[in-house]
């Protein structure tokens, strides 16, 4: 069999990528989160045929949805989509990969899933979020859901709010993002959790910060 070089887990499903860039999934698929075009569970890894002609470079699993980034910068999502966390512009579940559209100049470099929301980081160092947002976890200054990627202004060079962070001596982002699978999430510069006084992104509006022992981190390697 093929050697697996990447692995990510959702709640009850697993995603793996082989050394050749082929994508495999297995586990529970009630909401189509395996991406095989149906809602059938699989006990062993099955190749995602819809992406057989693409080389997968990054993967992430949400509670009931899955995201995959290909080597040419295309982002795909599938599975449970009640809150738009797949990013396909609708709220219907997807049992096959659906491409997530970004502005042409915003090539995706990283992706990470939360419980019911998703984050992406582009080569231009902009952060986009979509999915469940009623606890403020999308970082858009609103408590609404989004079914397409929306830039987080305050954390993105192309966002008008980024100047406010610069004036507060915010530290720059490194090449990795971490996401909690729950309502809380964090964008962590230099792989360090925000300290008191640092500017941090956070979910639940009652949280003053996201301390290390309060974040179950999911790592997306560059």
What are these regions (language model features)?
Residues 1-222:
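Eukaryote-biased RCC1-like beta-propeller repeat architecture
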């Amino acid at each position: 069999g093929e050697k697996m070089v990447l692995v990510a887990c959702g709640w009850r499903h697993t995603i793996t990528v082989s050394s050749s860039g082929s994508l495999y999934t297995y586990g529970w698929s009630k909401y189509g989160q395996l991406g095989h075009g149906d809602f059938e569970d699989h006990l062993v890894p099955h190749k995602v045929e819809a992406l057989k002609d693409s080389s997968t470079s990054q993967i992430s699993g949400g509670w009931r949805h899955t995201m995959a980034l290909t080597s040419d910068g295309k982002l795909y999502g599938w599975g449970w989509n009640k809150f738009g966390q797949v990013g396909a512009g609708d709220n219907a579940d997807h049992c096959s990969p659906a491409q997530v559209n970004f502005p042409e100049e915003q090539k995706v470099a990283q992706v990470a899933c939360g419980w019911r929301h998703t984050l992406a980081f582009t080569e231009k160092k902009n952060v986009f979020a979509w999915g469940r947002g009623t606890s403020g976890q999308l970082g858009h200054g609103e408590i609404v859901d989004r079914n397409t990627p929306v830039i987080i202004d305050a954390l993105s060079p192309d966002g008008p709010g980024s100047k406010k962070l610069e004036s507060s001596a915010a530290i720059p982002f490194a090449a990795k993002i971490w996401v909690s699978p729950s309502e809380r999430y964090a964008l962590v510069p230099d792989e360090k959790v925000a300290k008191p006084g640092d500017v941090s992104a956070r979910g639940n509006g009652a949280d003053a910060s996201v301390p290390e022992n309060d974040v179950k981190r999911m790592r997306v390697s560059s």
